Amino acid sequence: MKHLIRTDDFTTQEIESILADAELFSDGRFDRILRDKIIITLFFENSTRTRSSFEIAAKRLGAEIVHLDVANSSTKKGETLVDTAMNLDAMGPHAIIVRHQNSGVAKILSNHTKASIINAGDGAHAHPTQALLDLFTLKKHFKNLEGKKIAIVGDIKNSRVANSNIELLSRFKMEVILVAPPQFLPQSDLRTTHYLEDIIDEVDAIMSLRTQTERHSSQTYASLKDYASDFCITSEVVGDRDIIILHPGPVHRNIDICDALLADKRCKVLEQVANGVAIRMAVLKKLIYDV
């Protein structure tokens, strides 16, 4: 059984196939090909977009969704996460979608299940379906990504979204530039800067990231407003440039992106959300139906 833990679990050819399926699904062309299939969602961290879009994706393809209420599960009685997964797997689901605050959990569980494990985010490690929907959004806008430049701005060091996008967008020949204060920059061979203004005239897209305060061991800024004074994506910074704006959500208004830009047609945040359903439909098809 194939799992999706990281974007590099799929070949480039497989990703192209997923994008093609997502294009059909986004146009409303799909059948209930997962009828009689069962998918379990196992979320140990809060989620609005990812969980909802996976559930909508599964239902549109005809699958049954079972959501395990983690707060009332046997993990609260001392059952290990691996034992929980093995017991759920014994019930015969076709996929288990997992989000967990610790990096590596999805990979560990994939070693103990017959069902496909789909990583819906593990700590600061990876969020593969987010990167796939971001790629889909960018390709719909630009068609050919080769040579295009994207600035990823914000708390990159603590972002699973950044990790997955760096791998995937680089594979599709985009130049990724990292923009962040020193404490938010990971060690990387990529081009980096502390000032968005330095590269604003070069980039074709900006991906803003939320400050991951829940993953900080100590306070890094006196306040989020102090952070925003340097790294909020504002109308003044972007001006009238032909740049599209992305964000994986949730957006901190006027911290990550200003209100005016969120209402601007160049902002693709809601398009990303819509594309997330189509991409997750395509991923479910790939892992459950196309085997």
UniProtKB/Swiss-Prot annotation:
Residues given in the record as carbamoyl phosphate binding sites:
49-50, 99, 127, 130, 249-250
Q: Which reaction does it catalyse?
A: carbamoyl phosphate + L-aspartate = N-carbamoyl-L-aspartate + phosphate + H(+)
Q: What is its EC number?
A: 2.1.3.2
This protein's pathway reads: Pyrimidine metabolism; UMP biosynthesis via de novo pathway; (S)-dihydroorotate from bicarbonate: step 2/3
- Source species, domain of life: Bacteria
Sorted alphabetically, the keyword list is: Pyrimidine biosynthesis, Transferase
List the GO cellular component terms.
cytosol
Question: What GO molecular-function term can you cite, just one?
Answer: amino acid binding
For this UniProt entry, which residues form the secretion signal?
none
Instruction: Cite the binding residues for L-aspartate.
Output: 77, 160, 210
A Pfam family this protein belongs to? OTCace_N
| Broadest EC class assigned to this enzyme | transferase
**What assembly does the database describe for this protein?**
Heterododecamer (2C3:3R2) of six catalytic PyrB chains organized as two trimers (C3), and six regulatory PyrI chains organized as three dimers (R2).
Q: What does this protein do?
A: Catalyzes the condensation of carbamoyl phosphate and aspartate to form carbamoyl aspartate and inorganic phosphate, the committed step in the de novo pyrimidine nucleotide biosynthesis pathway.
Q: Which PANTHER family did the record assign?
A: ASPARTATE CARBAMOYLTRANSFERASE (PTHR45753:SF6), ORNITHINE CARBAMOYLTRANSFERASE, MITOCHONDRIAL (PTHR45753)
* This protein's name: Aspartate carbamoyltransferase catalytic subunit
Specify the species: Sulfurimonas denitrificans (strain ATCC 33889 / DSM 1251)
